Amino acid sequence: VKLIGYFGPWALIGLLVVVFIESGVLFPVLPGDTLLFVAGMLAAGTAAAAHENANFQLWQLLLFIPIAAVLGGQAGYFIGRFIGLEMFKPDARFLKQKYLDEAHAFFEQRGPFAIVLGRFVPIVRTLVPLTAGAAKMSYGVFTLFNVIGAVVWSTVLVLLGYFLGQFA
């Protein structure tokens, strides 16, 4: 709640920037799930007294958050596609070539539903688009499942917060 309140009248823009960055731009430590849940509660009006500048309309959240998530995922895909292989080194601490090979095998075995499921796992949410791009997953397939994952992920979390906010 403090992070949303920090943005003040720019709370919606701040929320969208966080979602964009966390969805695939190599900064996996942002609290995306929590922010979406709290934003849903704010849309229900439960925390409006504490953060009157951070009021959201439910329709704004349901429209703009998936767009920010899709765009972040697409950016991550292109980062992985065009510079991803250079980022994966055999002796790297985090982005090892072995991880790219394992991710490619994971995508091959489980198909593109891994993209949808990855949305619900912090940190993984940021790395899935990068890995899909670096593993040369089909752009069309990635885009389709990125959109599905972004819409399902954001809608579920925002609506959970919204409905809980109505009963609080």
Feature roles, as predicted:
Residues 136, 140-144, 156-159:
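Membrane-embedded catalytic cores of phosphoryl/pyrophosphoryl-handling enzymes
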Residues 19, 23, 40-44, 157:
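Structural signal for membrane-spanning alpha-helices in multi-pass inner-membrane proteins
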Residues 16-35, 118:
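Transmembrane alpha-helix interface/packing and boundary motifs in multi-pass membrane proteins
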Residues 22-23, 143-145:
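Alpha-helical segments in transporter systems
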Residues 148-168:
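C-terminal membrane module of polytopic membrane proteins
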Residues 64, 68, 145-149, 153:
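Alpha-helical transmembrane segments of multi-pass membrane proteins
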Residues 1-17, 41-130, 134-141, 166-168:
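Membrane-interfacial helix-loop-helix
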